[in-house]
Amino acid sequence: MAKANEHFFYVLKCSDNSYYGGYTTDVMRREAEHNAGIRCKYTKTRRPVKVIHFEKFETRSEATKAEAAFKKLSRKNKDSYLSEREEESK
């Protein structure tokens, strides 16, 4: 169960190898919703999807700003962003 004060930016990898970035308070629940075709037109036709990255933020505003910034990136820059964060987590 998610805590009310947890805010996450997450990235899904879709079955067509595209990325989807979003905001949620519960990453596991939101992944299940995407895979069930609930509340997202983009991923509905690109299932199954898998969470490949998420970041926790103190506020909703910070998390949605991270989401917006990610969505503005080119595919090449999205790949770089995800690779850099993967290296940081090792």
UniProtKB/Swiss-Prot annotation:
<dbReference type="InterPro" id="IPR050190">
    <property type="entry name" value="UPF0213_domain"/>
</dbReference>
<feature type="domain" description="GIY-YIG">
    <location>
        <begin position="5"/>
        <end position="80"/>
    </location>
</feature>
<dbReference type="InterPro" id="IPR000305">
    <property type="entry name" value="GIY-YIG_endonuc"/>
</dbReference>
<dbReference type="Pfam" id="PF01541">
    <property type="entry name" value="GIY-YIG"/>
</dbReference>
<dbReference type="InterPro" id="IPR035901">
    <property type="entry name" value="GIY-YIG_endonuc_sf"/>
</dbReference>
<protein>
    <recommendedName>
        <fullName>UPF0213 protein lin0209</fullName>
    </recommendedName>
</protein>
<comment type="similarity">
    <text>Belongs to the UPF0213 family.</text>
</comment>
